[in-house]
Amino acid sequence: CGALWSCPVEQAGQIPYKFVVSFFQHHRMLQLKDRPLWLTVKGGSARYVRAIQSQANITFRKTGVLHVSRSVNDVVVETTQGSERFDWVVFASHADDSLKLLKDPSAQELDVLGKFRYQDNRMVVHSDTSIMPKSRRQWASWHVHVTPTQATEQMPFQHSGTHYGFSYWMNQLQNLNCTTQVFATLNPNFALNPKKVWVERHYR
């Protein structure tokens, strides 16, 4: 659970049992045989994002939203480039960010959106093959890394408090046409070769 939901081991035990079992059943993770074959979108998520954008009537693009307010007949979205009125608005953002954007949140919105909590995560894209099994036959699309260690000065890429990390083998998942092995490691709990680190991002 700590690896699947990127949370510290002490919090993983607090996840409701029914939710865990339901998740495992839905993703066929309890099957020992005839497991489903997972597919990925060729070109990555950017491809279907572009497809949606090509069909959408976009008023503002890459524009910061200041706040959203409601009137009797419509919803007003105020941005750094002006404001626009809409019949309704769908928030595709974290619950706490959505709550901050609402200029006049209702009691129900305050109650529901205020209950969400998030875990900070670090994603590192790199080509350090030392994280993988020595035998190439044991390489898989993703690997779980379990260690009890904490971040130290000698391990700058480690995420403090997280004992579970895992790596995606991007060549396998995205069919990359290159000889360099590329990995995306979430919450690395081991030292990575700094010379082989390409990109580092932080998410919630």
Set out the residue ranges of the language-model regions:
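Mid-domain catalytic core of redox enzymes
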Residues: 66-204
